[in-house]
Amino acid sequence: MNEKNIKHSQNFITSKHNIDKIMTNIRLNEHDNIFEIGSGKGHFTLELVKRCNFVTAIEIDHKLCKTTENKLVDHDNFQVLNKDILQFKFPKNQSYKIYGNIPYNISTDIIRKIVFDSIANEIYLIVEYGFAKRLLNTKRSLALLLMAEVDISILSMVPREYFHPKPKVNSSLIRLSRKKSRISHKDKQKYNYFVMKWVNKEYKKIFTKNQFNNSLKHAGIDDLNNISFEQFLSLFNSYKLFNK
């Protein structure tokens, strides 16, 4: 993702009143280390450094890096890295959380990056409301892949009036809470394959007719358009048994 395209997709929240309202839904304490995705003009960064042990802001726009550094000149518990989040290597040997008001047009890429390439125990993101709903939709491949690794919650609405420039749609604050992976390391490739075939309704490529009917019955599924993640895991476990 080049710098020009990312800058054109950025919408900033600058009102301290609105930022404080959002922050009430984010669990932070003075011991937390935070990686912030996109410092923007430093308005959220400033509130994060007041609440946390240390903040590392990752910002691709060189000018915004300087703006953030100038805004936080009275604080020393932060650093701003002029880097592309999609190329950033998160540490593997420390505890941290992630926060970001992320660009709509690369939300999928960013969320894949931070769930699968970081060990953050909690992730807070401001995303487009429709995107947030899709993350809870078990008919979507991204939702099924994420739900195996994190619990996903929509914490609050973020009205489009909070942003400058004002986008066409409302946003949501979401939380992704890390959990023990529901898929063993040796089964991850098999799970990815199963997810893609299921979402594309290529049932014949993963089950025979009898296997399919028995798997649905075992999972307690009456409606293919309305299944829970636990029911989906039951289907995957049946698939594994049939393909030992």
Swiss-Prot record:
InterPro entries: KsgA/Erm (IPR001737), rRNA_Ade_diMease-like_C (IPR023165), rRNA_Ade_Mease_Trfase_CS (IPR020596), rRNA_Ade_methylase_Trfase_N (IPR020598), SAM-dependent_MTases_sf (IPR029063). It catalyses: adenosine(2085) in 23S rRNA + 2 S-adenosyl-L-methionine = N(6)-dimethyladenosine(2085) in 23S rRNA + 2 S-adenosyl-L-homocysteine + 2 H(+). GO terms for cellular component: cytosol. The keyword S-adenosyl-L-methionine applies. GO terms for biological process: response to antibiotic. This protein produces a dimethylation of the adenine residue at position 2085 in 23S rRNA, resulting in reduced affinity between ribosomes and macrolide-lincosamide-streptogramin B antibiotics. S-adenosyl-L-methionine binds at N11, I13, G38, E59, D84, N101. Its EC number is 2.1.1.184. This is rRNA adenine N-6-methyltransferase. PROSITE patterns: RRNA_A_DIMETH, SAM_RNA_A_N6_MT. Keywords: Antibiotic resistance, Methyltransferase, Plasmid, RNA-binding, S-adenosyl-L-methionine, Transferase. Coiled coil: none annotated. GO terms for molecular function: 23S rRNA (adenine(2085)-N(6))-dimethyltransferase activity; RNA binding; rRNA (adenine-N6,N6-)-dimethyltransferase activity. Induction: By erythromycin. It is an enzyme of class 2 (transferase). Belongs to the class I-like SAM-binding methyltransferase superfamily. rRNA adenine N(6)-methyltransferase family. Signal peptide: none annotated.
